[in-house]
Amino acid sequence: MQLDIKICGLKTEDAIAAALDGGASHVGFIFFPKSPRNVDIETAARLRHLASGRAQAVAVTVDADDEMLDRIVEGMRPDVLQLHGHERPVRVEALKKRYHLPVMKAVSVREASDLEVLPAYRGVADRFLLDAKPPAGAELPGGNGIPFDWSLLASLDGKVDYMLSGGLSAVNIGEALSIARPRGIDISSGVERAPGEKDPDLIRAFFSAVRAARGKRE
C-alpha cells in the first residue's frame, strides 16, 4: 500500500530539498501567526514552486476568513487546503466550492469519542488529518509534539482516508505504522532542532526510519 508522507511547517529551501529528496508526497506551509512555523505567502509561493511536479503543496490554515484564504490561494496556488481549526462541515463544503481544491480536515483526538465527528465531514472533506488534541492552554492546534493512543483508530471504517499526525518521529514511526496502519503520515515538530526550525538531517533520518519500518512489515 502506498504511504503518503507530508512534511509540514516548511520555511527554508534546505528543508524542502530534504523533504523532496526523501520522497515526500506532500509539503505543508502554515499560515497561522501564533505558530513558530508561520510563513508569509511570498516565501510559501517560492518554496511551493520548488515542489512543483514532485509533491503536492498544502496550505494549512486555522479558522481563516475568506479574505485571507483568497490571498493564500491566489498568491501560493496550493494543491490542497488543510483546515486545522473549528471549521464545521458547512464551512468545509463552502470552501471546496469556492476554491475547487481538495480539502483535508484536521480532527483533534484524545479519546474514542473524538472520532464521532468524522461521519459529519464525510462527503465534504476529501481526507482527514488525525492529530493529537493539544494540551489545555496550548495556543497551537497542532505541532505540539505529543502523540495520542493510536489503537483508538482500530475502530475506524477502512474506507476512512486519513493522515496520522501528532508526535511522530524517527523513534516511534515504526510502532505508529504497525498500530494505526494509516494511508498517510504527517510530521512537523519531530524533524525540528527547535520550534519552527526544520533540521534536514532529522528529515532524512525520518525517511530512513519509515523505509526501515515498511521493509519489516513487507
Curated annotation (Swiss-Prot):
Pathway named in the protein's UniProt entry: Amino-acid biosynthesis; L-tryptophan biosynthesis; L-tryptophan from chorismate: step 3/5
Keywords: Amino-acid biosynthesis, Aromatic amino acid biosynthesis, Isomerase, Tryptophan biosynthesis
InterPro entries: Aldolase_TIM (IPR013785), PRAI_dom (IPR001240), RibuloseP-bd_barrel (IPR011060), TrpF_fam (IPR044643)
Superkingdom, natural source: Bacteria
Record HAMAP family: PRAI
NCBIfam families, per database record: PRK01222.1-1
Protein name per its UniProtKB record: N-(5'-phosphoribosyl)anthranilate isomerase
Annotated source species: Chelativorans sp. (strain BNC1)
